[in-house]
Amino acid sequence: MGTLLWPRPATTAFAPPIAAGPSAAHVVAGGGVKGRPRRVSLALRCPDPRPRVIQEGRGRRTASRSYVAAGGAAAAGAGDSSRVLPDLQMVSRIRGVFFYMVTSAAAIVLFIAMVVVHPLVLLFDRYRRRAQHYIAKIWATLAISMFYKLEFEGMENLPPNTSPAVYVANHQSFLDIYTLLTLGRCFKFISKTSIFMIPIIGWAMYLLGVIPLRRMDSRSQLDCLKRCVDLVKRGASVFFFPEGTRSKDGKLGVFKRGAFSVAAKTGVPVIPITLLGTGKLMPPGMEGNLNSGSVKVIIHRPVEGDNAEKLCSNARSVIADTLLLHGYGVH
């Protein structure tokens, strides 16, 4: 017979919460590789003016999961509350396969359109590239509309395409880019250089004017910031994920100052955007799966000023407060 494992009784009514260790965002923002400090403003943290709040879960666990192991094998350890059941996981994988099939098919057709119009774009609209961004919006909308619902709030806070700005948002998932492209704004993303090597997608990014960045390379970071400043001065907008990477646990990480130094130097507003739900649909590390659900995009009022540290702090506070309001965590 199998062995029934019963959890060891705790010495107190409720076990004390375990303090969370430093997140990947803290490590990247604070020390770079092996503790080496970065030398450019892109890697500098911005302070959080709000007092640190320790949040408790919405509910307390009243029982522990027990596992029955057949054939005398024992299964130990607590179950992960975010684990997807096998049947639901299979459905998510199938949805993921169809999502990439639709995305790839649409990308091939629309990439041809981008190539056709590119000479005219370089001639008449080299910096904003509105025609290319319009095609990208169609592509993202086609890819998304069949798989998850989008809800927008605060669209009136978006400046017109003719007004340059620095956009910033929290980063939860691979789906963030698709979602943001549906806004139809001509902002230039910053992406790892390796992504440009992906057929069709990488080539389309080049046509859109996406800015390449070699991570852990201080010279590349400095060149990236200089290019962003130049683009903004020429009337284009830029988009940053100030955390520098996707959140592994869904909590908002530390912001770096690079985006806000660009805004401070050029005098353009910062447009904070909060993304809700993308990390649940396609969590980091599970890019082959696509869960069902919806995504909400909240565009906040512009933040203006000439002090990069204050811009960073104010923009992060707006996004952090919104995430907390909707039940998300903040580091």
Which functions belong to the PLM regions below?
Residues F111-K137, S145-M146, P160-S218:
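Catalytic core of membrane glycerolipid acyltransferases/transacylases, capturing the structured
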Residues L150-E151, P212, V238, V270:
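Hydrophobic beta-strand scaffold residues
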Residues A143-S145, M205, L231, A263:
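A generic structural signal for well-ordered alpha-helical segments
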Residues G2-P17, R50-P86, M90, L222-H331:
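Non-catalytic C-terminal accessory region of glycerolipid acyltransferases
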